[in-house]
A protein has these predicted regions:
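Short, small-residue-biased leader/transition segments that mark boundaries at the very start
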Residues: 1-8
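Cys/His-rich Zn2+-binding cysteine-cluster or related metal-binding knuckle/ribbon modules and their
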Residues: 13-19, 28, 38-103
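Solvent-exposed alpha-helical segments within well-ordered globular domains of core cellular machineries
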Residues: 20-24, 38-42, 53, 57, ...
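Conserved, well-folded catalytic cores of nucleic-acid-processing
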Residues: 25, 29, 47, 62-65, ...
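Long C-terminal interaction/binding lobes of large macromolecular proteins
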Residues: 140-152, 157-210
């Protein structure tokens, strides 16, 4: 046809080196491709300076001050998160989730009064993520010292989530603690954070013993 399309890296040579660096860093974020990174970069360039300063300050502040809860490993700005420090919660029931976003999804239902344990990932041999790469050791240490009656495994219904659920079940069963899994009403491969509250509640209420 005689028409050549310019690849994105070629177009980027016309940008300022600072803009290129910004685009490159933004493209490392999950779900952000090269074109989306460009749009975000130029949006940031058009933002008022005080808004840019607030954005960078918020990022730095979150990164420097947010830590793992010493009890459940969720992300918090306290040593012990508000849920774990709440005496009105049922500390004998622990729901295991993959990340803090999943914890938030179940909290929005307003129906779970137990506590959580956040793994910060799932076992994935394909990606080289093993049991030692997520917060499993912390979970087992917690079960050894706390009086826990039930562990509800609420990992995602992806292959990684199911693999993790089975692994956790095998670890916990010898302790005599009841282990259950949220019901299969959650779509296969679905991330809990994107599922509506009614579906999450039904999955919790319909949980099955492992």
């Amino acid at each position: 046809t005689g028409v050549q399309t310019c690849a994105l890296p070629i177009l980027m040579e016309y940008y300022s080196s600072h803009i290129n660096k910004l685009i490159e860093q933004l493209s490392h974020l999950p779900g952000i491709g090269a074109k989306s990174a460009q749009r975000l970069a130029f949006h940031i360039m058009n933002m008022p300076k005080d808004q840019v300063e607030q954005l960078t300050s918020s990022i730095t502040g979150a990164r420097e001050n947010v830590q793992y809860c010493k009890c459940c490993c969720t992300l918090t700005d306290r040593e012990i998160c508000p849920i774990c420090s709440n005496d009105k919660r049922d500390h004998s029931v622990i729901m295991v989730v993959e990340n803090t976003r999943d914890l938030a999804a179940y909290e929005k239902t307003g129906k779970f009064d137990g506590v959580y344990h956040v793994l910060h990932g799932a076992i994935s041999p394909m990606l080289g993520i093993g049991p030692d790469d997520i917060k499993l050791k912390e979970l087992m240490q917690r079960l050894a010292k706390d009086e826990v009656k039930e562990v509800i495994i609420a990992t995602n219904s992806s292959l990684e989530g199911e693999t993790t659920a089975m692994y956790i079940s095998k670890l916990i069963k010898p302790t005599g603690i009841k282990v259950s899994r949220i019901a299969s009403g959650v779509p296969v491969g679905g991330d809990l954070e994107y599922i509506d509250e009614v579906t999450l509640l039904r999955a919790l209420e319909g949980r099955v013993d492992l």
